[in-house]
Regions:
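Bacterial N-terminal signal peptides that target proteins for export
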Residues: 3-14
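Bacterial N-terminal signal peptides
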Residues: 13-23
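Boundary at the C-terminal end of the N-terminal hydrophobic targeting segment
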Residues: 26-28
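Active-site-adjacent substrate-binding region
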Residues: 31, 35, 56, 77-81, ...
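A non-catalytic alpha/beta surface segment that caps or lines the substrate-entry region
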Residues: 39-99
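Acidic/histidine-rich, surface-exposed loop or edge segments in extracytoplasmic proteins
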Residues: 39-50, 117, 203, 208-209, ...
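Active-site-proximal beta-strand/loop segments in catalytic clefts of secreted hydrolases
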Residues: 44, 76-78, 96-98, 107-111, ...
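Acidic/histidine-rich catalytic neighborhood of metal-dependent amide-processing enzymes
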Residues: 121-228, 233, 237, 242-245, ...
Length: 307
């Protein structure tokens, strides 16, 4: 064999090796599609204000219903007793089956505040970003469960809950968390609650300036798993630099004994100046932050499935 022929064969072999390994290498380096989550959020937020009793709220319901029409979708309609009287509300639950016996719930609220109805409050970060996040997570779960397949771990249910926000400007235990209080009670009655291995809440985490607090009431072992997921992706600078107790949609489940965690960035804008104002708009959220969220959520799901 000539010197030229020898090195030609070596080069050919290396080329084949690279072509063979590249798909696996690329797969191992893939990140969550935060751009898709941002686009879903943009479409959803374009509906406008979506407070209870409004036409925008009805449009938000129709948006979710249409998007998930080919999935295992349940609509959980109920009437909430509120300071303005009985109000029709609706949770949306999308189910993706798993091999293991049990359920992981990922949740977000989707409505905006009734008491902000007189301003153009669209809740891009607060309700909009996390609706987009769960929709993009659904894309991945849908691909994994296509053609009758099941997820390797537990079933995953996505909950888009209604009525998280208070009707009145002052938040109280009785005027807030309507959807999750209703759902936790319903699932306690019918035995569903016993199947839930973890409840993971996403709230206000599309913020470009992402700084997720450690919600201090959250279940310790879930916090530890999220830390593990964060460490894997080297996202430490975005997570858990301070502790804070937050009244949020995880509490109705936590109080009934379900391991629960609230993934929240409660400080939004300089001195929290964007929170619950008409400054909560799409220009304040980013695909980068949603990529971080999605990576951590999906890895946390995987880690829970390994317990």
């Amino acid at each position: 064999m000539s010197f030229f022929s020898f090195w030609k064969k070596v080069a050919t072999g290396l080329t084949l090796l690279i072509v063979t390994l590249t798909p696996l290498t690329a797969l191992s380096q893939q990140h969550f599609n935060g751009a898709a989550a941002l686009e879903y959020a943009r479409q959803f937020v374009a509906i406008g204000p979506r407070f209870s009793t409004s036409s925008g709220h009805a449009k938000a319901e129709a948006f979710l219903r249409d998007h998930f029409r080919h999935d295992q979708l349940e609509e959980d309609a109920f009437t909430a007793s509120t300071p303005i009287g009985p109000v029709a509300m609706r949770n949306f639950i999308v189910r993706f089956p798993g091999k293991k016996n049990g359920v992981i719930v990922l949740a977000t609220h989707y409505e905006t505040n009734y008491w902000l109805k007189n301003i153009n409050y669209v809740g891009a970060n607060d309700g909009g970003s996390t609706t987009g996040l769960l929709m993009a997570i659904a894309d991945q779960l849908r691909a994994q469960t296509a053609h009758g397949k099941t997820l390797d771990g537990y079933s995953v249910w996505l909950v888009f809950d209604d009525g998280e926000e208070s009707i009145q400007p002052t938040w109280t235990d009785s005027d807030s968390l309507y959807g999750t209080r209703h759902l936790a009670a319903k699932w306690a009655r019918d035995g569903t609650l016993e199947k839930i291995k973890a409840f993971i809440l996403a709230d206000m985490i599309g913020d470009k300036d992402l700084d997720i607090q450690r919600e201090s009431q959250s279940t310790d072992w879930l916090v530890a798993l999220v830390r593990q997921a964060v460490k894997k992706f080297r996202y430490n600078r975005y997570f858990f630099k301070k502790d804070e107790a937050v009244s949020d949609d995880h509490l109705p489940f936590l109080r009934r004994g379900v391991p629960s965690i609230d993934i929240i960035d409660i400080d939004y804008g300089p001195n929290d100046s964007y929170h619950h104002t008409d400054k909560d708009t799409m220009d304040k959220i980013s695909a980068h932050s949603l990529t971080i969220d999605g990576d951590v959520f999906l890895e946390t799901i995987r880690l829970i499935g390994m317990r």
